[in-house]
């Protein structure tokens, strides 16, 4: 009886609640890692598709694809899965002046790439972006202030970029590591934004989400291969696309506050795509006439 009683109690312990085979739960750390890897894989697949389109379409279409939310879009989608609508709206507000910083990065690179190496041109452009991003933290941004910063920036930079847009493009020979490298860089950025968002808050997350990783990888990969002027032409053609991207960020802020994160993200994406399609259509009509 004692043996049977001990055995019975032992069976209760072994088969008790929480320890049955069907009730075993995955470790929270493992769930986080697997979820993060899945998000990185989805982002990488998105970047690979966009990169193939960019390389096969010439400087104008390539620039329009590059200015779609290829890296910022996945970052914000995954942030929306982890945070509420207020977080996303505040992040978008912080992203507005960063979009202005990106056009200054583009102008700096385009000017320097005419005569200097990829590392020098990109390094100086990245330094400008970092300085402007750091300076933006000194201000309490509003929607009107962010829009004004973009309006002034584009009014200055777009005319200066225009003279660099038209260059004969050489044949681009792709290396086997180009797209995997670009995809891994963007996936790493998304992973960094998602992982740090809980600690750094919406404003830093919004800044990090707009780090110009797609433009940077394009500069560093294409410049040594086809030269500074053709690469600068691709970047210069992206100026008008960045304007639409800025409008999309403003739409994200307003729509998220009114309708929630899902609707805000969809409307922001629709804004960016519609803007770039309008640019493409306008360009085709000009060529036709």
Each language-model region and where it sits:
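Structural signature of hydrophobic alpha-helical transmembrane segments
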Residues: 31-43, 65-66, 84-101, 143-153, ...
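C-terminal ends of transmembrane helices
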Residues: 46-58, 103-117, 159-170, 219-229, ...
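Selected transmembrane alpha-helices and immediately adjacent juxtamembrane segments
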Residues: 58, 164-203
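Cytoplasmic-side transmembrane-helix entry/capping segments in multi-pass membrane proteins
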Residues: 60-69, 116-127, 145-151, 171-183, ...
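A generic, lipid-embedded transmembrane alpha helix
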Residues: 66-82
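Hydrophobic alpha-helical transmembrane segments in multi-pass integral membrane proteins
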Residues: 79-80, 134-141, 187-199, 245-261
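Small-residue-rich transmembrane alpha-helices that serve as helix-helix interface/gating elements
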Residues: 151-153, 212-213, 263-277
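Transmembrane helical segments that form the transport core of multi-pass membrane transport proteins
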Residues: 188-226, 232
